[in-house]
């Protein structure tokens, strides 16, 4: 079972039908099946390697390490990142399909660590290269902290999915044609507040009053007749 409490609308409804899209279904299933790409360079990555053992058993969280960035949706950076390694890290991140997430593990990845004071080739924070979703400080952080960071990322993904659904419902737009046969995209009109500008139609010649026509006729200056 998924340990993340996904905010369902009604848990007590029986014999109900849930309608969704294929994209939302894949996002929901991603909560328990994150495929990480391991980018480790130093001692912090050794702490993450201990999660593979039977004591922590990170397989129960659905984590399946991938060797190709095209098959991963999460990249775990651990250790010092140098200037020469920066282009390869950016390329790996760009090759990952959307949506993609980043967890920065350890002080060296987050701020440069002890190498940031007197090193000319150390990147002072991996967030200067790629966007980071979860920061995990420590030198090195414990395996329990890594599991907690992954749990926080899963909660963040669940909130993003739910907020996206609410936002799409609030910004529900309807497509319709006006009386002038013009196509418009507007918000939902279930509230009864209609935009009268959509229903404006220029009057035809049969609807022009005689007084309006006479005023226009007076303004027109005809050339003098001989």
From Swiss-Prot:
The keyword Nucleotide-binding does not apply. InterPro entries: NADH_UbQ_OxRdtase-like_20kDa, NADH_UQ_OxRdtase_20Kd_su. One of its GO terms (biological process) is photosynthesis, light reaction. This is NAD(P)H-quinone oxidoreductase subunit K, chloroplastic. Its main location: plastid. It is found in: Plastid, Chloroplast thylakoid membrane. It is an enzyme of class 7 (translocase). Belongs to the complex I 20 kDa subunit family. Its cofactor is [4Fe-4S] cluster. NDH shuttles electrons from NAD(P)H:plastoquinone, via FMN and iron-sulfur (Fe-S) centers, to quinones in the photosynthetic chain and possibly in a chloroplast respiratory chain. The immediate electron acceptor for the enzyme in this species is believed to be plastoquinone. Couples the redox reaction to proton translocation, and thus conserves the redox energy in a proton gradient. Its EC number is 7.1.1.-. Keywords: 4Fe-4S, Chloroplast, Iron, Iron-sulfur, Membrane, Metal-binding, NAD, NADP, Plastid, Plastoquinone, Quinone, Thylakoid, Translocase, Transport. [4Fe-4S] cluster binds at residues 43-44, 108, 139. One of its GO terms (cellular component) is chloroplast thylakoid membrane. NDH is composed of at least 16 different subunits, 5 of which are encoded in the nucleus.
């Amino acid at each position: 079972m998924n340990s993340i409490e996904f905010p369902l609308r009604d848990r007590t409804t029986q014999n109900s039908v849930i309608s969704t899209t294929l994209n939302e279904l894949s996002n929901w299933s991603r909560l328990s099946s994150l495929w990480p790409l391991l980018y480790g360079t130093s001692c912090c990555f050794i702490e993450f390697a201990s999660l593979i053992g039977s004591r922590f058993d990170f397989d129960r969280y659905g984590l399946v390490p991938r060797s190709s960035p095209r098959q991963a949706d999460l990249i775990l950076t651990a250790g010092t990142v140098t200037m020469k390694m920066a282009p390869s890290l950016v390329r790996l991140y760009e090759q990952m399909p959307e949506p993609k997430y980043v967890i920065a593990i350890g002080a060296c990845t987050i701020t440069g660590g002890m190498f940031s004071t007197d090193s000319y080739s150390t990147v002072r924070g991996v967030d200067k290269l790629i966007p980071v979703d979860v920061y995990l400080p420590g030198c090195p952080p414990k395996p329990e902290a890594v599991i907690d960071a992954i749990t926080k990322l899963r909660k963040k993904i669940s909130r993003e999915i739910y907020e996206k659904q609410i936002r799409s419902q609030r910004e529900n737009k309807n497509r319709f044609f006006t009386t002038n046969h013009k196509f418009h995209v507007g918000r939902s009109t279930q509230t009864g507040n209609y935009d009268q500008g959509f229903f404006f139609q220029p009057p035809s010649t049969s609807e022009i009053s005689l007084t309006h026509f006479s005023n226009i006729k007076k303004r027109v200056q005809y050339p003098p007749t001989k």
